[in-house]
Amino acid sequence: MIILGIETSCDETAAAVVRDGRFVLSNIIRSQVDLHQRYGGVVPELASRRHVTSIVPVLDLALEQAGIGPSAIDAIAVTEGPGLAGSLLVGINVAKTLAFVWEKPLIPVNHLEGHIYANWLTLPGQDEVPEPTFPLVCLIVSGGHTELVLMRGHGDYVLLGRTLDDAAGEAFDKAARLLGLGFPGGPAIQKAAEQGRPGRFSLPRAWLGESYDFSFSGLKTALLRVLEQYQRRPARRVAAGQPFPEYVAPEYGPSVPIADLAAEFQAAVVEVLAEKTARAAREFGATMVLLAGGVAANAALRQRLREISPVPVRYPPPILCTDNAAMIAGAAYYLAQRGVRADLDLDVHAHLPLVTRTLLRAGEA
């Protein structure tokens, strides 16, 4: 089964062709980082406008690289949520149009489920990735979400924990802004941390008792308090005659230990994520831990989980950690096996949860 996937939930315009939920025939991503860097984060209005101008060329290239035309496609898959409403709307409208004109089934996909299914994908030229065996503990870590999920089968998810405030990726973005490292924050923090010494400063870890929930807002505030000792001028936004104010980074004195603070901040985030995930894998008898989402590309998180997990750890290659359409097409294959379809009145669901049911004890599994 060949599925064309479309992903426009935030600031990447993406289209991909995937065979049988596993094999990537093409995976085209057009990033908007250059557009949003000057603002210190994603501007939703600008993101949706860029999707409008990018989506058709991206689709054309995805089909061209896959070497197929519309007649070879069995279904159209699209992200229905969660994400930015204006961005999601572009992808959904295009997907509905193609489904109507080409007379193909339309499959709606949860963006978070797509991130999980990136772990099933094999890129062109790679050895085939074996299918994971259930049950799995999945750590979904991105700019907008941090969730720990028990996956007992295709479509069978139970929520173990989630962030109570900032997502891990959001925490990295905010910390990078405080440190003057730019956007996106995750790669910037990781690069700076490579030159730093974690432990020179002591930033808090929010363990929240035996809970599998997460909290990163206190960590961000603690970093701010340390930086205030070195600050010459706070961060600010300057309109400069533009419709959206530009972000101007803070200024610090020459002695500010940016690399050490980045290393300690990263260590604090990674330690909590990894420890709770490894504990969940033990408690619920997982056969494997899956990392998913943009923060899954973080080398320190990957390494720490490999060190302490009681079971093997799998994570996608970096190109499949970021938002992409191959993961949407991959997830759609397994949805199609369960008969999931959408009508042409499919709408945006900006706050769509992956799962609402919470597992409180291992015995409930």
From Swiss-Prot:
**Keyword Repressor annotated:** no
| Highest taxon in the source lineage | Bacteria
* GO MF entry, a single one: N(6)-L-threonylcarbamoyladenine synthase activity
| Originating species | Thermomicrobium roseum (strain ATCC 27502 / DSM 5159 / P-2)
Q: How is the cofactor bound?
A: Binds 1 Fe(2+) ion per subunit.
The EC number(s) this enzyme carries: 2.3.1.234
Where's it found, cell-wise? Answer: Cytoplasm
Q: Name one GO biological process term.
A: tRNA threonylcarbamoyladenosine modification
Keyword annotations: Acyltransferase, Cytoplasm, Iron, Metal-binding, Transferase, tRNA processing
Q: Name the enzyme's class.
A: transferase
Checking PANTHER family in the record gives:
TRNA N6-ADENOSINE THREONYLCARBAMOYLTRANSFERASE, TRNA N6-ADENOSINE THREONYLCARBAMOYLTRANSFERASE, MITOCHONDRIAL
**Catalytic reaction list:** L-threonylcarbamoyladenylate + adenosine(37) in tRNA = N(6)-L-threonylcarbamoyladenosine(37) in tRNA + AMP + H(+)
Which HAMAP family does this entry report, sorted A to Z?
Answer: TsaD
Binding, substrate: I140, V141, S142, G143, G144, D173, G186, N298
- According to UniProt, the name of this protein is tRNA N6-adenosine threonylcarbamoyltransferase
User: What family classification does the UniProt entry report for this protein?
Assistant: Belongs to the KAE1 / TsaD family.
Q: Where does Fe cation bind?
A: H111, H115, D323
